[in-house]
C-alpha cells in the first residue's frame, strides 16, 4: 500500500533537488522546509557501512552537542545512600534506590533518561522488559552507568545525548531544533560526524559513510555531501 503524502509535504519536496547539498546549504533548506504548526526538531539519518549483527560492527556512544538539543529532558537516577542525594543536588528530576526500581517495575516511566551507579545495575538489569523497548536501559557505552553522577547529570542536561546504529546500520538522531540558526545546527551536526568517525567499530570494512540525510520533523529528506561534512576545514569555518 502506497503511503499518502500530504499536499504540504509534496510542495516542500519540490524545493529539494535530487542531489547532495553542501552542509550549510542543506541546513538552510531544512529551516526553510520546517513549516509545521509546532516547533520541529532537526533530524539526521546516517547510513553506515556496518552490520550490527556482529558485535565488532556495533555503534553505541554519546555526543555532546555544543549548541545543545533545544529540549528539556527529565533525568532519573538509581543509586544508593549518599549518591541519591548527590544526584538530586546535581539536578536530577527523579532519584531513588530500591523504591524507584520497584516503581519502574510497576510501569512508572515518567523520564527521558535513566542513569544508574554500577552497584545497582544487577537490580536495574531485571527491568529489561520495562526499559528495553523504550531505549532507557543504562549502559557504560552510553555514559549512563557511572559513579560520577554530578558530571553525568550536568552533561546530559546540557545537551549530551546517546545514540546507536539500528539493526540495519542507520543512525537516527535529533541534533537540535529547526529554529536554531543554520550555523548552530552545523556545529551540532559536525560534532555528531566527528563522534561517529572517532567511534568507528573495529569490524567496519570498506566504505564507512554511505549516506547522510537531514530533515525537519515533518519536512522532506535533504541529502548532505558526506565529503564536505567530513572536511576538517568545516570545523574551522
UniProtKB/Swiss-Prot annotation:
Keywords: Repressor, Ribonucleoprotein, Ribosomal protein, RNA-binding, rRNA-binding, Translation regulation, tRNA-binding. InterPro entries: Ribosom_uL1_bac-type, Ribosomal_uL1, Ribosomal_uL1-like, Ribosomal_uL1/biogenesis, Ribosomal_uL1_3-a/b-sand, Ribosomal_uL1_CS. Transmembrane segments: none annotated. Pfam families: Ribosomal_L1 (PF00687). One of its GO terms (molecular function) is structural constituent of ribosome. Part of the 50S ribosomal subunit. Binds directly to 23S rRNA. The L1 stalk is quite mobile in the ribosome, and is involved in E site tRNA release. Protein L1 is also a translational repressor protein, it controls the translation of the L11 operon by binding to its mRNA. This is Large ribosomal subunit protein uL1.
Amino acid at each position: 500500500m502506497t503511503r499518502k503524502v500530504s499536499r504540504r509535504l509534496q510542495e516542500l519536496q519540490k524545493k529539494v533537488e535530487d542531489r547532495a547539498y553542501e552542509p550549510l546549504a542543506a541546513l538552510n533548506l531544512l529551516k526553510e522546509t520546517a513549516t509545521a504548526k509546532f516547533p520541529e526538531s532537526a533530524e539526521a539519518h546516517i547510513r553506515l557501512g556496518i552490520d550490527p549483527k556482529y558485535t565488532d560492527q556495533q555503534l553505541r556512544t554519546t555526543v555532546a552537542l555544543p549548541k545543545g538539543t533545544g529540549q528539556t529532558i527529565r533525568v532519573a537516577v538509581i543509586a544508593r545512600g549518599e549518591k541519591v542525594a548527590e544526584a538530586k543536588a546535581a539536578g536530577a528530576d527523579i532519584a531513588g534506590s530500591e523504591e524507584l526500581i520497584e516503581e519502574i517495575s510497576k510501569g512508572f516511566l515518567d523520564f527521558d533518561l535513566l542513569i544508574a551507579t554500577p552497584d545497582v545495575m544487577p537490580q536495574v538489569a531485571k527491568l529489561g522488559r520495562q526499559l528495553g523497548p523504550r531505549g532507557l536501559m543504562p549502559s557504560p557505552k552510553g555514559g549512563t552507568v557511572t559513579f560520577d553522577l554530578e558530571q553525568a547529570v550536568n552533561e546530559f542536561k546540557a545537551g549530551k545525548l546517546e545514540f546507536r546504529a539500528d539493526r540495519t546500520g542507520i543512525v537516527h538522531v535529533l541534533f537540535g531544533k529547526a529554529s536554531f540558526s543554520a550555523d548552530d545546527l552545523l556545529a551540532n551536526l559536525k560534532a555528531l560526524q566527528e563522534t561517529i568517525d572517532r567511534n568507528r567499530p573495529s569490524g567496519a570494512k570498506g566504505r564507512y559513510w554511505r549516506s547522510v540525510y537531514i530533515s525537519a520533523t515533518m519536512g522532506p529528506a535533504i541529502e548532505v555531501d558526506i565529503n564536505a561534512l567530513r572536511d576538517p576545514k568545516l570545523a574551522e569555518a
